[in-house]
A protein has these predicted regions:
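Sec-dependent N-terminal signal peptides
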Residues: 4-13
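N-terminal, post-signal peptide beta-strand-biased segments of exported outer-membrane/organellar beta-barrel
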Residues: 15-132, 136
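Outer-membrane beta-barrel porins/channels
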Residues: 18-23, 124-294
Length: 294
């Protein structure tokens, strides 16, 4: 019998996103809300654990996954804009996409499940992952100058964006199966490892051309953090299969926050955490404290 699965996906992402990708979810482009299995239900729809009580104990010994996404990287855009000529209509269409994100963006993530600390049993699951994220943005002004030149807009926004962070995510997932529906939640503790990035609220750079010449100015505020703590929450619901149809919905990181610099205080037991060459950040030979920025 041919089955039809209809999924409704509602996802709210914070700084950190879904984890535990496998080959199946990559092939399905993330449409996993009603068909994820076992440990891989975590991060997509925790309610699915409730309908898997008959399955045996599942234990993940090792694995990792990584990915790169952006607002230009796709087979469609590469095929559409590859060639020896880029017409004005093509430029306008492409530039609208860049404007929505404020530039050309690249987001990279790396997920490493902590060995032997990921398992499911019945309607419960415990997961632990080391997650490393980075986000880089080429300024919109640079793209505008490459596509159109600077004749029509003498002042260009050249603000660069960059952030990198690492954290450990520990999650406890449980689901309550009812007669025809299952609801589930994932409670997550987020252990911040490090953070460094350009503050987008106070940083800026521009390039100006006029009759007198070409000049520019800029100001960047770099923030850093080592050690932090926070919490996250995923919630989901899914129905049992009925005449080949399954419906599901989930909120991933419905609540999610990390407060940085929670483990940097100097006490009588010893010095604060240091990573040579990385943390604490130095500027013109001076070491910055955990609450300072440049």
């Amino acid at each position: 019998m041919k089955k039809i699965i209809l999924s409704f996906i509602l996802i709210v992402t914070c700084t950190f996103g879904q984890t535990k990708r496998d080959a199946r979810v990559v092939g399905l482009a993330g449409t996993y809300t009603t068909i994820a299995d076992g440990i891989f239900s975590v991060g997509y729809n925790p309610a699915l654990i409730g309908f898997q009580q008959h399955k045996p104990f599942q234990w993940q010994l090792f694995g990792f996954d990584t990915g790169v996404i952006g607002n230009f990287i796709s087979f469609e855009t590469i095929a559409e804009y590859s060639g020896d000529t880029l017409y004005t209509a093509d430029k306008d269409k492409l530039f609208e996409n860049f404007e929505d994100a404020g530039g050309l963006t690249f987001f990279q993530d790396f997920h490493l499940p902590i060995p032997a600390l990921n398992f499911t049993s019945g309607n419960l699951a415990f997961t632990s992952n080391a997650i490393f994220l980075s986000n880089f943005k080429l300024p919109i002004g640079l793209l505008e100058m490459m596509m159109y030149g600077n004749a029509n807009k003498p002042e260009l926004d050249m603000t660069l964006g960059y952030e990198i962070l690492g954290l450990n995510e520990y999650g406890l997932t449980f689901a309550i199966p009812l007669k025809n529906v299952s609801t589930g939640v994932t409670l997550k503790y987020l252990q911040g490892l490090f953070y460094m990035g350009i503050d987008p609220e106070t940083s800026y750079a521009n390039l100006i051309t006029d009759d007198k010449g070409l000049y520019g100015s800029g100001r960047y505020l770099l923030r850093q953090g080592m050690g932090g703590a926070g919490f996250g929450l995923d919630i989901g619901i899914v129905t049992k299969e009925f005449q080949g149809w399954t419906f599901g919905s989930s909120l991933i990181n419905a609540i999610g926050t990390i407060a940085w610099n929670k483990t940097n205080s100097v006490n009588d037991d010893g010095p604060s955490i240091t990573v040579p060459g990385i943390y604490p950040f130095t500027w013109e030979g001076e070491e910055l404290g955990p609450n300072e920025a440049v």
